[in-house]
């Protein structure tokens, strides 16, 4: 196990005390909100640090007592009984703190942009993309998060060729960031008379929702085109010049949005563009920082097949951590917490292993 960073623990305690003092002094409302946010982030960590320090002090007292030859037999027996319990408590607290003190991803607390695109498999792939979107939508609903569709291109037989949505809430990106990659489905299409199993796929990308302070987009770096957009009356009825396409010239990234309001379209397209640029910057920094990263979970390679959904067997397999669950129906209803937590645990274990190697 990697050693606990004692200096970092002391610094966190010092900062927590400073925040408590500043909040008690009655600062301005905007300052108070920022302090309260940092306070709630630090509180669980500092609570564990204090519990750990208390347990270490208890252990030291017990060991001192046992070394004292003048202590009577009854007291020594009680101390010897307590010793294993205190050591076990310290070990458990050390493991918990190893996780709490891991380097934080600055984007973890952010909302996210979810992009799902049908891949190989034609109409079946589009239907599967629709199934995946509903799965994430239901998971988000259970978490109390808000889902808003930014743009959608429907498949001919249903589902989506492409759908982009924002999922708004605290910690959305932390929960969903390991969903990026190729999701494969194996099932018998409803139109298949012979009952043959077809394989199709959809690609999922989960991006942290970037704010203006996260990424700067210069006006001269973008080209905005206005296009005709279909209204409610059909393909060529009620068309308006509201659809917007924004091209980021330095990178070639293109984003479109086709809601009724041109103003809304521009804002939504800029929101997606900002998040894609922010994500590209994060990916570049990650690859430079961890070229030798051993964890498959955190690789972020969106061309990698990460999960298979086998409908005839009711089986879902996540290939990165060799996890197989026979609860496909429940997962498609949004019950993906078990997989999400297993992926996070695997990633944290790989981070801990790397920290141990560095020490």
UniProtKB/Swiss-Prot annotation:
Keyword Protein biosynthesis among UniProt keywords: yes
A Pfam family annotated for this UniProt entry: PCRF
Maturation and modification: Methylated by PrmC. Methylation increases the termination efficiency of RF1.
Region listing for Disordered, in residue ranges: 280-306
Cellular-component GO terms for this entry: cytoplasm
Subcellular location: Cytoplasm
Its job: Peptide chain release factor 1 directs the termination of translation in response to the peptide chain termination codons UAG and UAA.
Protein's name according to its UniProt entry: Peptide chain release factor 1
Organism: Rhizobium etli (strain ATCC 51251 / DSM 11541 / JCM 21823 / NBRC 15573 / CFN 42)
Name of the encoding gene: prfA
